[in-house]
Amino acid sequence: MTVNADRALSPVPLMQLATGFWVFKTLAAAHELDLFSRLSGTTGTTAGGLAEALAIEERPAEMLLTGCTALGLLVKNDDRYVNSPIAEEFLVRGKPYYFGGFVQMLDQRLYPGWGRLGEAIRTNRPTTWDPDRQSSMFDSEDPRLLAVFWEAMHSLSTFTARALGQAIDLSGAPRLLDVGGGSAAFDIELCRLYPDLTATVFELPNVADIAARKVKEAGLTKRIETVAGDFFADSALPGGYDTILLSMILHDWAEDRCRAILQKCWAALPSGGRVIIAELLVNDARTGPPAAALMSLNMLVETEGRNYTPAEYRAWLRDLGFQDLRTVWFEAAGANGAVIGRKP
């Protein structure tokens, strides 16, 4: 029985794990070469046509096209390659849910840091920035990397915001405070979903400027405002809101700092107000799901935080006095659920 069981085992799953970077780098190279935007709205390309357009040899052009087709990013019709539906929807510049910014950030910022994951595990220190020179990942001296980061967050957040807005009813709470709201992606999408909603993005001054630009581009300046501030340094959060949103924020920080943020949320909310914590939630058994567990490792190379469980968030909220605690699950790239609490 033991021998037969051993023979049934296969290293193929390990091969898939070990070569996972092949998949990502194929996607990243195609994005770097702007392949999907080039193909959008066309009858497709041949290997020779792509080689000519990119001024490269036909051999690598054919190999890239074959790889992207195998991954479901392209479809081959006769000898011509066209975008698959998922590539056309999410990897073409200018599309509403363009995801390419996140791919670029992974390639330029996170891929090198993940190459030092073993070091991060041994030292319990981030590897995408130098903790001896910076107080956090947001203090980067390289404006280009910061721009890449925030564009990536906008890509990741836009579709996630729509999933959140469809999973949680905001129709009876017209005033939203988005704490650490980044480029205002959540606010833009939620205001599009809820015509009566108004929102305020509370962010660091340099990020608030990015948010203001995105809001103006979206034509929502009458419904979304930006307020510059620091949720650690400032003594209090702005008040007068029905709902406070913490979207992909708390996983950046250790427990004591998360509790400090939530304490300020409690103080800012009126009776009946809600706090919504949207994250890739690790399950209470701490066995997955994979996206949340791996995002937690990503927090190791990026931050002092980790991805927490619903039980942990509920405990912190309960300690502050929040009631009607519940977890709502949904499917999106940046979050798989939200923990909600109401101030009595």
For each feature predicted by the language model, list its residue ranges.
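Alpha-helical subdomain
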Residues: 1-76, 170-171, 175-344
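Conserved Class I S-adenosyl-L-methionine-dependent methyltransferase catalytic core
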Residues: 2-5, 11-41, 52-174
